[in-house]
Amino acid sequence: MPQPPVPRESRVRAGIVPPYLLLRIAAAEEHYDVAADAARRSLLRDEPMRELRVEGAHPGLLPHEHTRSATTGRDHDVEAEGEGAPVDAAVPEPAPDRRISDAQGAESLPGHLVRTEGQPATGDVAVDQAYDGLGEVWALFERVYGRDAIDGEGAPLEATVHFGDHYDNAFWDGERMVFGDGDGEVFRGFTQSISVIGHELAHGVTEMTARLRYRDQSGALNEHVSDVFGALTEQYAMGQDAEAATWLIGEGIFTELVQGRALRSMLEPGTAYDDDVLGRDPQPAHFRDYIVTDADNGGVHLNSGIPNRAFALAAVELGGFAWEHVGRIWYDALTGGTLRPNDGFAVFAAATLAAARERYGDVSREVAAVANGWRAVGVEPE
């Protein structure tokens, strides 16, 4: 069964845009009148974030049998059945339950419900992008990993769009995904990126499973897991293999005024943007460059680049579709019940290696690729 809900006062507002980037924008008022003001107000809204301090982990789901959908052609998982087990045709197929609300520029949640599952497109771009994006995230988790929604039991997928006045972020608040429209100078609307939508929903999955504390190394892992499943959602939706994938998080949310491709690059941390005003992407790509700081909840958005690169390197080494191999390993590690809220990189690396051995065998390409990925970024599994 899923973990009991986290009390609202203990929930983390896990935003996709790091505070260090908002601070740079806030200080750039001579270049961006609207964006600087929007960034300052966004920082004030995000300041009351609380740390997640919940102990324990959900044991997760059992391994699933690998099958291919006859209707979509995509890979997905079904519960392994005993030989000759009868199939109950009356059991309905899992389906998403999407509920999109509109905050109409206010900061109160959830806003006005404007589109529910099965309803036609509204014509509001943000509403319809959120609806479609949630469908893609649900498809990845259900068809590949056998997880029906965030809690694994078909809970509604709730999202609110048009949050705040020029709000420069998107976040998971413990119940729903919330998307701002951006300021129009630096950021476009945050529903434009499937990787952002997948990133935010994955925070909910982490909250229901390993509950990685949102600070220091465990917080960087929390952000890393969301980046992983954000990237995999985009790759799955677009049918991209590991070589064709961009490995970018938030591609398309910068306007043409910014010299940058995205918020983060998983394959090449530190290269996502290099802008005369906003500066250069500060993410480290190796553990020797780990940033010790009190800001950004102990550098959760900064240091997530280290495990991000380990994952991407393992996926590229294996080739093919990343969600089929390294994605399965990371999902097994996240939901396997061995992680604790304060675990760091070395413990998580060991969990992924154990998951790879369990699924693919001690002597396998998958185990070697995962080990090589962690070795390349200087993390020694504990």
Language model regions located:
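Zymogen propeptides/activation segments of proteases
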Residues: 1-195, 207-382
